[in-house]
Amino acid sequence: MNNTKSTIKIIFFGDIVGKPGRIAVRDFLAEHSDKYDFVVANIENASHGFGLTEKNYNDFIEYGIDAMTCGNHIWDKKDIYSYIDNADRLVRPINYPKNVRGTGSRIIEKNGIKIGVINSIGRVFMGLADSQWDIVRDEILKIKKITPVVIMDF
């Protein structure tokens, strides 16, 4: 990617589940990562089918994943609490209450291009999630002051 490029090739992996999912993504990116400018993955079930360990988070970075999104299962592995505040590629649902650790959006710069990433979760059977519509709209407007490129995982 460079500042004169008019298109950005983004690949987004849906819910990566357990070791088979991690291996599939690792092997795919080892062969095809040069075809994409930015790689996003939903990783909330990547560690043994539930949650995300810090080791697997770091493995995904090594595989070439630029941004990671998640949902309610991110909390299934308790070690998430020891690293989520420093996990600069991880985006938890933005419509969780403000006191929930982690961040619901971030801007990630790669090769001179700033890309906004927002994550949201639905409310059905998700007790602590706030309505996402106003929150997401406001966040998109905030990010668009910095970059026109915004990826939304819902």
Name each region found by the language model.
Residues 1-154:
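Acidic, metal/ion-coordinating pockets
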